């Protein structure tokens, strides 16, 4: 998210090749990834990915403008995906209040996009922003569905 602010938007077509949006959900085009294969080289990206985006940055290599441009494009794709998922949920539930936790909840650009584009009216980011916040949300959902009392302290 931080690097994205310094990037330029010209890699959208490449992002559209590797991250597909279908029926308001997303999936990775696995032709571009190799992390799911049981292989010994432990490479995350396939040769096809490297041909499309170039060699991964080495640990001792400085960031180039291209890295900032990649961050910008990934950020925009992330916003597009989450916005579509949230829009679908709002349409189904008619609830325009959203709670986000985990790394997604800390993405200020995403949150601003959801409010600015009127996808939701309000976003709550719990103080426990790590992924364990999802466990708390699941517990609250269960209690609500079972009409059990939620005790607030």
Protein language model features and the residues they cover:
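Short acidic/glycine-rich loops and adjacent helix/strand connectors
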Residues: 1-153
